[in-house]
């Protein structure tokens, strides 16, 4: 297992709980002899920290491990910044669901001690790139660990578009939009729109129509290396948006083309040894268990 010496810390701003957890975490790591590097915005909320400070981009270049304190949204933002750096990322949950951030604050020190001693599970999670072109010229780009979503923005009108997968025409669709999700994102927005849950190790992409006008338009699961092309009808009277993880946005125009494909660089996500995807689904999604009723 990889030896961690230089550890970067990154936290969600605007939360007292996150700041307190960051202080605890920094003091613990320094006390254990690790070199701690704070992301610059994180350092601003920890006055008197007395450790090195770095930009988010450089954090991935100089650290052996980056620990993100916050919710899944915080880790999504970190993933987009760090995926190209080949640095492992670990999440401490200070949000609500915590599908990605699975170190608990109440057991943070013992769980971290296990991870730092080499007892952890590592996963590779792929991201999606989205390229927007207008009259053949690039006008926007974004990437997402969870999903790329075409939606009407502030408009209440449906969007008309043509869908192609690997150059093959799939259908013409009128709907509120389309969610193009990774397995990581299948338990997020795609799930609420009726998409399937995919195991994180699957090399697949799911396309989930949002309130389609044709009821036979159903979610489609395709190979993870597929190129997905959406041609926004030039007859539309609205300017749709392309959102990446719900955090970055590109405004499109009628006639634009959105091309979505797997990002070459992957996120290295690490978990404690007891990480169990199905246990997380039971806990976070309220799945029942016969064990809860005294079954075997």
Curated annotation (Swiss-Prot):
The gene is nadK. It comes from Hahella chejuensis (strain KCTC 2396). This is NAD kinase. It holds the Pfam family NAD_kinase_C. Its main location: cytoplasm. Its cofactor is a divalent metal cation. Keywords: ATP-binding, Cytoplasm, Kinase, NAD, NADP, Nucleotide-binding, Transferase. One of its GO terms (cellular component) is cytoplasm. It is found in: Cytoplasm. It comes from the Bacteria.
């Amino acid at each position: 297992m990889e030896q961690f010496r230089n550890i970067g810390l990154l936290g969600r701003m605007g939360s007292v709980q996150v700041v307190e957890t960051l202080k605890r975490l920094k003091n613990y790591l320094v006390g254990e002899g690790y070199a701690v590097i704070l992301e610059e915005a994180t350092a601003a909320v920890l006055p008197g920290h007395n450790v090195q400070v770095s930009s988010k981009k450089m954090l991935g270049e100089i650290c052996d491990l980056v620990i993100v304190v916050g919710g899944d949204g915080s880790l999504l933002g970190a993933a987009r910044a760090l995926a190209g750096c080949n640095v492992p990322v670990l999440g401490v949950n200070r949000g609500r669901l915590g599908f990605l951030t699975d170190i608990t604050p109440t057991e943070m020190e013992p769980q971290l001690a296990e991870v730092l001693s080499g007892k952890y599970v590592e996963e590779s999670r792929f991201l999606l790139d989205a390229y927007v072109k207008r009259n053949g010229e690039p006008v926007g780009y974004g990437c997402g660990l969870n999903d790329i979503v075409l939606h009407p923005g502030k408009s209440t009108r449906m969007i008309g578009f043509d869908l192609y997968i690997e150059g093959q025409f799939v259908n013409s669709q009128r709907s509120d939009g389309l969610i193009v999700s990774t397995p990581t994102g299948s338990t997020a927005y795609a799930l609420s729109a009726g998409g399937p849950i995919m195991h994180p190790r699957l090399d697949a992409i799911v396309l989930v129509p949002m309130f389609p006008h044709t009821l036979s338009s159903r979610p489609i699961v395709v190979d993870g290396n597929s190129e997905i092309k959406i041609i926004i009808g030039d007859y539309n009277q609205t300017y749709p948006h392309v959102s990446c993880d719900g955090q970055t946005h590109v405004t499109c125009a009628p006639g634009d083309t959105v091309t979505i494909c797997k990002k070459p660089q992957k996120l290295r996500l690490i978990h404690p040894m007891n990480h169990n995807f199905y246990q997380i689904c039971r806990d976070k999604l309220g799945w029942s268990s016969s064990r809860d009723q005294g079954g075997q």
